[in-house]
């Protein structure tokens, strides 16, 4: 699929679903299902409810998207760090 065939839209994560899926509300109010891109999974970028994200949507199926960027907001909810440090 060529890059010209993808739509880039911003949205807010409403809900974290099982199996690394997310429910995202776009700026225009449309709710879509999304998953994290491979680069985000590889770099262990955590996506939580309330995060502002950028999605890529195919023009052929506007109900599914791929999250390719999580915006850093000062008011974004972050869990406290507890437990063992990562190795």
UniProtKB/Swiss-Prot annotation:
Residues 68-87 are annotated as: Disordered. GO terms for molecular function: ribosome binding; rRNA binding; translation initiation factor activity. Keywords: Cytoplasm, Initiation factor, Protein biosynthesis, RNA-binding, rRNA-binding. InterPro entries: NA-bd_OB-fold, RNA-binding_domain_S1_IF1, TIF_IF1. One of its GO terms (cellular component) is cytosol. Gene3D superfamilies: Nucleic acid-binding proteins. Residues 1-72 form the S1-like domain. Pfam families: eIF-1a (PF01176). The keyword 4Fe-4S does not apply. It is found in: Cytoplasm. The keyword 4Fe-4S does not apply. One of the essential components for the initiation of protein synthesis. Stabilizes the binding of IF-2 and IF-3 on the 30S subunit to which N-formylmethionyl-tRNA(fMet) subsequently binds. Helps modulate mRNA selection, yielding the 30S pre-initiation complex (PIC). Upon addition of the 50S ribosomal subunit IF-1, IF-2 and IF-3 are released leaving the mature 70S translation initiation complex. Belongs to the IF-1 family. This is Translation initiation factor IF-1 1. It comes from Burkholderia lata (strain ATCC 17760 / DSM 23089 / LMG 22485 / NCIMB 9086 / R18194 / 383). The lineage of its organism: Bacteria, Pseudomonadati, Pseudomonadota, Betaproteobacteria, Burkholderiales. The gene is infA1.
């Amino acid at each position: 699929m060529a890059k010209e065939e993808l739509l880039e839209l911003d949205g807010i994560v409403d809900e974290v679903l099982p199996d690394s899926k997310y429910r995202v509300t776009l700026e225009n109010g449309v709710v879509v299902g999304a998953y994290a891109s491979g680069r985000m999974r590889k770099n262990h970028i955590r996506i939580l409810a309330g995060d502002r994200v950028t999605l890529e949507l195919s023009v052929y199926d506007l109900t599914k998207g791929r999250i390719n960027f999580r915006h850093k907001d000062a008011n974004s909810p972050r869990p406290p760090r507890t437990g063992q440090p990562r190795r």
